[in-house]
From Swiss-Prot:
PTM note: The N-terminus is cleaved by ribosomal processing cysteine protease Prp.
Keywords of this entry: Ribonucleoprotein, Ribosomal protein
GO cellular component: cytosolic large ribosomal subunit
The protein, known as: Large ribosomal subunit protein bL27
Residue span(s) of the pro-peptide: 1-9
Top-level division of the source organism's lineage: Bacteria
HAMAP family according to UniProt: Ribosomal_bL27
Functional note: Plays a role in sporulation at high temperatures.
Subunit text: Part of the 50S ribosomal subunit.
GO biological process: translation
NCBIfam families: L27
Gene disruption phenotype: No effect on sporulation at 37 degrees Celsius, however sporulation decreases at 47 degrees Celsius.
GO molecular function, one term: structural constituent of ribosome
Length: 94
């Protein structure tokens, strides 16, 4: 009797992994309070990288360029100069 020695090979070629397929989480930058809105002191007004918007009256700038209210009041986004913007907080008249 004959004995057959059969050898089977893979029908699909092995596929290497790709170097793509990752992405960083969104940083949730941008305006956090709208123009004319009432805010309390310490409220974050605008999160940004760099100074896209500058701090105006009663607004401070954090270490990561976040703009925050220094006092309670109303938010006002304004233009100054030809191509710059600033955000200010004005106290509410009582």
């Amino acid at each position: 009797m004959l004995r057959l020695d059969l050898q089977f090979f893979a029908s699909k070629k092995g596929v290497g992994s790709t170097k793509n397929g990752r992405d960083s989480e969104a940083k949730r930058l941008g305006a956090k309070r709208a123009d004319g809105q009432f805010v309390t002191g310490g409220s974050i007004l605008y999160r940004q990288r760099g100074t896209k918007i500058y701090p105006g009256e009663n607004v401070g700038r954090g270490g990561d360029d976040t703009l925050f209210a220094k006092i309670d009041g109303t938010v006002k986004f304004e233009r100054f100069g030809r191509d710059r913007k600033k955000v200010s907080v004005y106290p509410v008249a009582q």
